Amino acid sequence: MKKKDNAERILGNLAQALNNLQGCREFSLLMPEVRVNVVHALPGARSGMEVAAVDGRITVVRGYPCAAGSPAWGASDHMARLIIEARKYSQGVNAGINFKCDNEIIKIVKKYARDNKLVFGWIDRTREPEDVAARDGSSMPWKIRQLVEQSKRLPDIFYEGDGWGKEPLFVILGVDAVSVVRMATEIARIYKKQKTKSA
């Protein structure tokens, strides 16, 4: 498939994923302070310009997830670098989404991963070496390496714990944007159901 055809297919997949996410009111409960992005990389992507994402990220408007902009190439930094690094360990990973992490959500996601035969992982940011944290661009390779060493492969779902000035976050990795959003919205609906029961 030509690169142009791939690019159009990816933008279409991302637009569909975004539409699905914006229709899931429950996902607003998983919105982190840093907001959410969904990314989808071209095969063999080596730079952020080869990764499509939601321009301006996704926030909450009137109780629903809402994109600040449209899917665009080069619209993400952090999540784009994460996907590019993750692909060094698994070529099947093309897309990702981030969302809020706390102890209650961790329990739900662990069970969801177990029930769906997904590999669950976590990163202990307190173990990150000072020289790695201080050097631009060094954290991402270290984080992905930690995940692979701990899980013996790249996890499907993982969280980053607290770090200095860092918000804990979950990340789902998958073959395309639609599939990672499907998992995220399923988790959001389970989370909402549990919160309603305990209210």
Task: Show the residue positions of the predicted features.
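Conserved mixed alpha/beta catalytic, RNA-binding, or beta-rich assembly cores of soluble enzyme
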Residues: 1-199
